[in-house]
């Protein structure tokens, strides 16, 4: 396994390449802020998010772990893919990013507040290289897609809805 491959989001460096970590103090601040949002919302009906009254969470809360599915973060529909001859094998797993770089390249703390009941999951689609599905002259390439995640701005002590890139699918390209 490539330890420097993204753990969740396309532009997130792997363990060896990480320069930023989210401290416990920051996690506590976020938990408290999310708990406040949950309190404002009161009791939630079945199937409704505790957070849907908050504009940022309403716009951006689609990746809540309890409701997200792998197909939500695929770049395209399931096989057969019309625009690619074939697809390399893909391993999917859900992943909870705690930080990332936005589509504009800015470092952000992504909201994960398990105690308050709000966790965000994206599905990571990793190509299994070394497959012969691409024939002898092709190679697996990764598509990119965007997801909108709830982030926390420590300076302003507020939530934002921001765009991140995820990798998904592994089409074959002949080069």
From Swiss-Prot:
Signal peptide: none
Location, primary (coarse class): secreted
SS bonds (residue pairs): 8-167, 10-95, 60-161, 65-121, 75-168, 88-140, 127-170, 134-172
InterPro entries: Coagulin (IPR000275), Cystine-knot_cytokine (IPR029034)
Tissue: Hemolymph.
Pfam families, sorted: Coagulin
Cellular localisation: Secreted
Keyword terms, alphabetized: Disulfide bond, Hemolymph clotting, Secreted
Gene3D superfamilies xrefs: Cystine-knot cytokines
Any one of the GO CC terms: extracellular region
A GO biological process held by the record: hemolymph coagulation
Subunit-structure text: Coagulogen is cleaved after Arg-18 and Arg-46 by a clotting enzyme contained in the hemocyte and activated by a bacterial endotoxin (lipopolysaccharide). This cleavage releases the peptide C and leaves 2 chains of coagulin, A and B, linked by two disulfide bonds. Coagulin molecules interlink to form a gel.
Family of the protein in this entry: Belongs to the coagulin family.
Protein task: Coagulogen is a gel-forming protein of hemolymph; it hinders the spread of invaders by immobilizing them.
Protein name as annotated: Coagulogen
């Amino acid at each position: 396994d490539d330890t420097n491959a993204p753990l969740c989001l396309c532009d997130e460096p792997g363990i060896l390449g990480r320069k930023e970590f989210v401290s416990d103090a920051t996690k506590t601040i976020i938990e408290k802020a999310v708990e406040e949002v949950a309190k404002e919302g009161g009791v939630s009906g079945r199937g409704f998010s505790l957070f849907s009254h908050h504009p940022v969470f309403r716009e951006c809360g689609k990746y809540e772990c309890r409701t997200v599915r792998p197909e939500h973060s695929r770049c395209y529909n399931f096989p057969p893919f019309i625009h690619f001859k074939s697809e390399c094998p893909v391993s999917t797993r859900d992943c909870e990013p705690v930080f990332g770089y936005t589509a504009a390249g800015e470092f952000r703390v992504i909201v994960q507040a398990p105690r308050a009941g709000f966790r965000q999951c994206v599905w990571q689609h990793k190509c299994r290289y070394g497959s012969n599905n691409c024939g002898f002259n092709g190679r697996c390439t990764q598509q990119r897609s965007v997801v909108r995640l709830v982030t926390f701005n420590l300076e302003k002590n507020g939530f934002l809805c921001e765009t991140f890139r995820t990798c998904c699918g592994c089409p074959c390209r002949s080069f």
